Amino acid sequence: MFTKTALFVAPLLALTACASSMAPAPTFSQAGMPAAVQVPAGHKVAMEAVGVGQITYECRARKDMAGHEWVFVGPDAKLMSRSGQVVGAYYGPPATWESNDGSKLTGTQLAVAPAGAGDIPLQLVKTQTAVGMGAMQGVTYIQRVATRGGVAPTMPCDGAKQGTKQIVNYQADYIFWKAI
């Protein structure tokens, strides 16, 4: 009888230990965020990732005035867990976040707020389309925070350089939110 009980209880204890060691989903206070990029109430963090990659800019003629400017073309980044594992990718256009599990979403920028000098702005994105079952399923907002680098090149952009592309490195935290 003791052997049968031990064989039944041991796996239950192991499962209980595993369950109690799982960390709860992180919570991120919106209090320190600029109002423009705060996620609306009624949402919880579903996932977080660190985007590490490049942003491409192209020297183009200005649309509404004379001269040229560096124009954002798109990102190409790996999405990493806090432990350094690649969990997905971020690319565009259109802005697309794709999980290694095959789920992905596209989004539209709602707002930006200034970040530090030399850093791309903080950003709030609303999900437009989502496909696949997995990590991206049910995500309604994406917040870009803790940005480093990624701003347009400082080198001159003129008619002689029109069509030239420059790639700059960047890093940012992406916080994925779901409705409660």
Q: Predicted regions span which residues?
A:
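Non-globular disordered terminal and juxtamembrane segments underlying protein topogenesis/assembly
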Residues: 21-22
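Primary mode marks residue(s) on the alpha4-beta5-alpha5 output face of response regulator receiver
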Residues: 25-56, 63-180
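Bacterial N-terminal signal peptides that target proteins for export
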Residues: 1-8
